[in-house]
Amino acid sequence: MTRLEVCNVQCRINDRVIVDDVSFTAEPGKLTAIVGVNGVGKSTLLRSIAGVRQFNSGDVLLDGTSVTDYTPMQRARLMAFVGQEESPSPDLLLGEMVALGRTPHRKPWQVGQRSERRIIRDSLALVGLDHLIDRRCDHLSGGERRRAVIARGLAQGADLIMLDEPTNHLDVRHQLMLLDTLRASGQTVVATTH
C-alpha cells in the first residue's frame, strides 16, 4: 500500500499564493481529510498532489519517491483522482463509464474479459450501484452520478485514491455508506470536505 507525504507544498495561481507551506502524511489503509471552508485551496492542493496541476514549491512523495519522478501513466496506476465537479459521460452505460477507470491497467485485449467485468461490477457494488450497470448515465440522479465517478476511481485499482468533496450530492445514508466503504477498502484515501 502507498504512503503519501506532502512536504511544504506551495501552489500559486498567477502571483497569488493559494496554498502555502502545507505538510501532512496519509497512511495506508487510513482516510485523511483536508478540511476547510470554500475557497481556501483544498481542491487546488488535491489537484496538485494528483499531478493535475503543478505545485510551485515543496514536494509530494509516494513511498518516498517524488511524484515528479513518475510518468503520467505511472501516476495513474499509483493514484486515482476524482474531482469535485466530475460527472459521467451521459451517452455511456454506467458499466462502460466505470470501465474507463481501468484504462491505466489493462491491455486492449483484456477489455471485456470476465476478470475486468468483475472489477467493474465490484466497484459499482461498493457504492451501491451494481444493479444499474446497464443504465445510461444520463438517466442517473445527481447522487448516483457522484457515486458513479467514485466507482470509476475505485475501479482504477490504485493504492491511493483522492476525492474532492466526495459526499457532494449524496443523502446522509449514502454519505455514511461511502465513508464506511472507503475506510474498509484498505487504500490510502485523501478527501476534501468543508
PLM feature spans:
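Catalytic Walker B motif of ABC-type/P-loop ATPase nucleotide-binding domains
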Residues: 161-165, 170
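Conserved structural motif at the start of ABC-family nucleotide-binding domains
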Residues: 4-6, 18-21
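Helix-to-loop junction immediately C-terminal to a conserved catalytic motif
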Residues: 50
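Conserved ABC ATPase signature
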Residues: 110-111, 136-140, 144
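Conserved ABC ATPase "signature" region
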Residues: 99, 114-132
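The feature captures the beta-strand-to-loop junction immediately N-terminal to the Walker
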Residues: 35-37
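Conserved ABC transporter NBD signature motif
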Residues: 58-66
